[in-house]
Each structure stands twice: as C-alpha cells, then as structure tokens.
UniProtKB/Swiss-Prot annotation:
Lineage, broadest ranks: Bacteria, Pseudomonadati, Pseudomonadota, Gammaproteobacteria, Vibrionales
Gene Ontology MF: a single term: proton-transporting ATP synthase activity, rotational mechanism
InterPro entries, sorted: ATP_syn_F0_a_bact/chloroplast, ATP_synth_F0_asu, ATP_synth_F0_asu_AS, F0_ATP_A_sf
Protein name: ATP synthase subunit a
One GO CC term on file: proton-transporting ATP synthase complex
Gene Ontology biological-process entries: proton motive force-driven plasma membrane ATP synthesis
UniProt entry keywords in alphabetical sequence: ATP synthesis, Cell inner membrane, Cell membrane, CF(0), Hydrogen ion transport, Ion transport, Membrane, Transmembrane, Transmembrane helix, Transport
Function summary: Key component of the proton channel; it plays a direct role in the translocation of protons across the membrane.
Transmembrane regions listed in the UniProt entry: 37-57, 98-118, 143-163, 217-237, 239-259
Subcellular location: Cell inner membrane
Membrane topology, from the record: Multi-pass membrane protein
Family per record: Belongs to the ATPase A chain family.
Pfam entry (one): ATP-synt_A
Subunit structure: F-type ATPases have 2 components, CF(1) - the catalytic core - and CF(0) - the membrane proton channel. CF(1) has five subunits: alpha(3), beta(3), gamma(1), delta(1), epsilon(1). CF(0) has three main subunits: a(1), b(2) and c(9-12). The alpha and beta chains form an alternating ring which encloses part of the gamma chain. CF(1) is attached to CF(0) by a central stalk formed by the gamma and epsilon chains, while a peripheral stalk is formed by the delta and b chains.
C-alpha cells in the first residue's frame, strides 16, 4: 500500500482493489483471520442489491394491472415466468417455497454480479478521497464469504427437507445403503455419500466465486495497465462478454439449487 499522496504502483493498485473493507482493516478486530472479521463492503452491497430486488418487485406487484402492462411489469413477468417454467420442469416435489426461492436467488445473484460492470474506480475513488474509506470492493459475488454463505444456506435447506420428507431414519438409510445395498458396504457408502453431500455446497459456492473473481481481476488488470482514456478499448469487449458470464452463473446457481432441493424431496426408495 502506498503512503498517503503517493501514486500506487501497478501491483499496489491491483492489491488495493482486491482488498475488502473489513473490521480488521478498521482496527475493530485484531486479526484478518478472526471469525468476527466481517467484510463490510461485501455485506453492504449484498444487502443493497437484495433490497433493490425486493423494492422493484414489490413496486411492480403493487402497480400490476390486468390491462396493458408497462415495460417494467412485462420485464418482471417475463423473469417470473422463466423461473416458474424451470421450477416446473426440474422440481418434482410439492413445495410452494421453491419457486419464490429460485426467483430470489436468480435475481439477487444477477444484481450482485452486475456490480462487476461498474467502472473499477467509480465508487472506490470517491469513497477513499471524499469519505476516507480506504478499501471498497463492490462485487459481493466475488467474495467467497458471500457465495459460500448462500451455498451453505441451500445446503441447510437440503438437509432439512431430506429429513422432513424421508424421516431421520430414511435419510440415514439413504446415506448408508446407497449405492451398494449391502451391510458390509455401509462404511464405503457413508464415505461416498458424505463426500458427495459436502461437495454440493462447496462446488455451488466456489463456482460462482471463481467466475466472478476472475472477471473482476481482468477488469482491474485492464485499469492498471492502460491509461484512463484507453481503458474502454479493453474493458468494453470484456464487459460485453462478461454479461453472458453474469447471466449464466446466476442461472447455474438457481438451477443447481432447484435440482438439489428436488433430490432432497425424493423418496428414499425412489
């Protein structure tokens, strides 16, 4: 980190923009590795995008008309129908929570991912020079804490519905007697099933984090290597391509959530 008033080197610029505003950076906890060290910027922007989603959809729902709908209502209805169709095709149980959950995840992840299209210094520069905030990362889904928290939330629902639908005994039987239905294979079955079970939230969270973090790094590298008046030459093509990544990652996270919860609702003898 450069001294106050001193220009950052390329490596310093990259390191600065990859650093979260945390309680440790503000001296409120002793260690970066502390359990209580919260990434304030990731938490703020994840809550902000979540509240934005709720506000937009609530506003549209209150003003919805059976007559000629406005452009925003048409757009929201298109998203709702898209998610509902995917839930109908993929989820084979009966649970009124799944469609709203899938809609929330899809829209929330898209909004968090879209923060990656905000110019690199658009928010961090005024935050640092006008508000005295030393670090600011604006892409919540490029923070492994956020993506793994969402994945662990899905994992908790998987376990809850597996036990609720199959019973504790049925869930234990599924772990112990699959894929090989013989008592002597129980230890091997347990090892395979537990690894498979734990891999689901890990892959779910890390896939989203890895793709969004990589995209953020590319934008930072472009900003660090080119003068401000030429940055658009590299940033614009990457941003256009990155829009596809943003949408695909939100869709994948939503679909895997639906698939995992559908598996949790399946009868253990299915």
């Amino acid at each position: 980190m450069a001294a106050p008033g001193e220009a950052l080197t390329q490596s310093g610029y990259i390191e600065h923009h990859l650093t979260n505003l945390s309680l440790a950076k503000l001296g409120l906890v002793a260690d970066e590795a502390s359990f209580w060290n919260v990434h304030i910027d990731s938490l703020f922007f994840s809550v902000f995008t979540g509240m934005l989603f709720l506000w937009v959809f609530r506003s549209v729902a209150k003003k919805a008309t059976t007559g000629v709908p406005g452009k925003l209502q048409c757009f929201v209805e298109m998203i709702v129908e898209f998610v509902a169709d995917n839930v109908k095709e993929t989820f084979h149980g009966r649970n009124p929570l799944i469609a709203p959950l899938a809609l929330t995840i899809f829209c929330w992840v898209i909004l968090m991912n879209l923060m990656d299209l905000v110019p690199i210094d658009f928010l961090p520069y005024p935050a640092e020079h006008w508000l005295g905030i030393p670090y600011l990362k604006v892409v919540p889904s490029a923070d492994v804490n956020i993506t793994m928290a969402m994945a662990l939330g899905v994992f908790a629902l998987m376990i809850y519905y597996s036990i609720k639908v199959k019973g504790l005994g049925g869930f234990a039987k599924e772990l112990a007697l699959h894929p090989f239905n013989h008592p002597i294979m129980i230890p091997f079955n347990l090892l395979l099933e537990v690894i498979s079970l734990l891999a689901k939230p890990l892959s779910l969270g890390m896939r989203l984090f890895g793709n969004m973090f990589a995209g953020e790094v590319v934008f930072i590298l472009i900003a660090a290597m080119l003068p401000w008046y030429l940055q658009w030459v590299g940033a614009l093509p990457w941003a256009i391509f990155h829009i596809l990544v943003i949408l695909i990652q939100a869709f994948v996270f939503m679909m895997l959530t639906i698939v995992y919860l559908s598996m949790a609702h399946e009868d253990s003898d299915h």
